[in-house]
Amino acid sequence: MSERRVGYAPGVFDLFHIGHLNVLRNSKQFCDYLIVGVVSDEMAQRNKGNRPVVPHEERLEIVEHIKFVDEAVVEDVPHKLEMWERLKFDVIIKGDDWKGTDKGDKLESDFAAVGVDVAYLPYTKRTSSTMLRRLLEREIEGF
């Protein structure tokens, strides 16, 4: 009997929407056991320049209750390799908006060095957290 293949899908998962659900559903094709890393508020602010609308404790609870997710953890470190050191996953799953970018190339290089595959999933163009955030900001300004 072979060992299970562990996947890791990190993300902010703010203002949870269909794109997030698609990522989690489709991530299961790459692994037997899916761990989702919910990026902490502090790391999200550091990486994206603004704090999520929904606090990470609530985002974590939402993700934990998605049937495709076997385990959810808070990602509270600046480098994905630090999460690998904790969790020892076999494949990291990212949106294909990373593919061919400097950050995607670095991710592939870093993980190749420790024998971890990088899998990409298509980005859902219909709905994004950025779009939802902009709509909310416009509504609040006009309120």
Indicate where each model-derived feature is located.
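Nucleotidyltransferase catalytic core that binds NTPs
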Residues: 1-143
